[in-house]
Amino acid sequence: MLKANLHIAQTDCTLANFDENLAHHCLLAEEALKGGADAIAFPELSLTGYNVQDAAQDIAMHIDDPRLDPLRELSRNITIICGGIELSEEYGVYNSAFMFEDGKGRSIHRKIYLPTYGMFEELRYFSAGQEITVVDSRRLGRIGVAICEDFWHVSVPYLLAHQGAQLMMVLMSSPLRMSPGAGLPPIVTQWQTIASTYAFLFSTFVCCVNRVGNEDSFTYWGNSSLTGPDGTAIQNAPLFKEQVLETVLDFSAVKRTRLHSSHFLDEDLRLISTELQSIITGRKG
């Protein structure tokens, strides 16, 4: 696989209204398919809204829930990645990323780092994921998916990249932390720096899918993006407005970048493993 057409859906959603949000997903997926897309990606918790609080247990569903059948059916022709509240087989409730492809659905990532500070309180309502792993997609190749706060921990993209991800996708529901003033809000420039830095250091594509709109006291800022493996921004969606970015992933760029600068390929994983084990066991520090 050398190229893939990916639509990045920077959307708003209706809090705790699964049916309305599902219909919006289906509409955009159908439009993307007509536009020649191989895949479409939506933000964190795009099927439910973010600030569901105690309703999370009532909204949570197994990945094989019949209510998700419309996405499964559409996925015969287009890969769909979106955010939802997952009910595990053990009845854990997770902030998860779902992937629908070839008529099947699967949970591909459970959010690990649940922010519970300031305006955030995710640990009150969700269990933390316990696995960092890539997923193989027929249309997108080997990808690594993270959810918002996960990407503020360098260990997550580090492990995904070294498992072979040539595309790292982060689903976000990132709100403003203060009233916007002159220039870009700090949270916007921080995320731009994160995307550019990881893309460059790991020589991989980084796709950020953020939402927009207002929800309770939260204002989501959008600015979804695709960054190339040399750390250069390829496309950006606007601030605060819904938009579907139509992007092309040329995976030959990963090869060119890694051959030009081999810092990623030169990483000594055995050394890192040994040193981490020393820290964990208390032999260092």
Walk through the language-model features, giving the residues of each.
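Active-site catalytic loop in hydrolytic enzyme cores
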Residues: 63-66, 88-193, 256-264
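Short beta-strand scaffold segments in enzyme catalytic cores
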Residues: 82-84, 95-99, 133, 224-226, ...
